[in-house]
């Protein structure tokens, strides 16, 4: 079982869907064991569908305030996980002034789904949520009392 990093940043393009979901999932799974934040190349208000699908699993995203990489100038992270190609480029720039690991998890942007059917759109968001949940559990395993 690998040790948890002390600080993780999840990053995507707008900090309105993917990275806030990942941040909230990581906090849900690991609580205060790890400092977790999220950012985007640009910022946009939290997406209502993201709030809805996270609420389905008992995680509240409604209070999320979007940030950009520029808002993180004084923060330090052990690892930056990028969820979009655009965020990957920004993370590489960030590592010029911060020695940290960068991982790219190519993650679909569900806000690009065009459908009049709300359930089709929600299913796309659920798919991203569930993929992020599994990826985070695989990369940062949750320790049970038997593991200690």
Where are these regions (language model features)?
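Phosphate-binding/catalytic loops
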Residues: 90-148
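Mid-chain, well-packed structural core segment of small domains
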Residues: 75-98
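Conserved active-site segments centered on acidic
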Residues: 1-71
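Residue-level detector of flexible, active-site-proximal loop/helix-junction positions
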Residues: 43-45, 87, 109-111
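Conserved small-residue
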Residues: 15, 54, 80-81, 132
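Structural signal for conserved beta-strand scaffold positions within catalytic alpha/beta enzyme cores
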Residues: 38, 63, 82, 103-106
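Cytosolic catalytic domains that perform sulfur/thiol-centered chemistry
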Residues: 2-7, 72-83, 125
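Short, charged low-complexity intrinsically disordered segments located at boundaries
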Residues: 55-58, 82-85, 102
């Amino acid at each position: 079982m690998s040790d948890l990093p002390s600080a993780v940043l999840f990053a995507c393009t707008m900090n309105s869907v993917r990275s806030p979901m990942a941040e909230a999932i990581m906090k849900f799974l690991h609580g205060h064991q790890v400092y977790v934040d999220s950012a985007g190349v640009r910022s946009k208000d939290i997406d209502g569908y993201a709030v809805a699908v996270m609420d389905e699993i008992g995680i509240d995203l409604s209070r999320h305030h979007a940030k950009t990489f520029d808002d993180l100038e004084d923060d330090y992270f052990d690892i930056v996980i990028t969820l979009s190609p655009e965020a990957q480029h920004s993370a590489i720039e960030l590592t010029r002034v911060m020695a940290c690991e960068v991982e790219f998890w190519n993650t679909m942007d569900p806000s690009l789904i065009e459908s009049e059917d709300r359930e089709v759109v929600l299913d796309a968001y659920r798919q991203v949520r569930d993929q992020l949940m599994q990826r985070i559990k695989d990369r940062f395993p949750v320790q049970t009392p038997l593991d200690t």
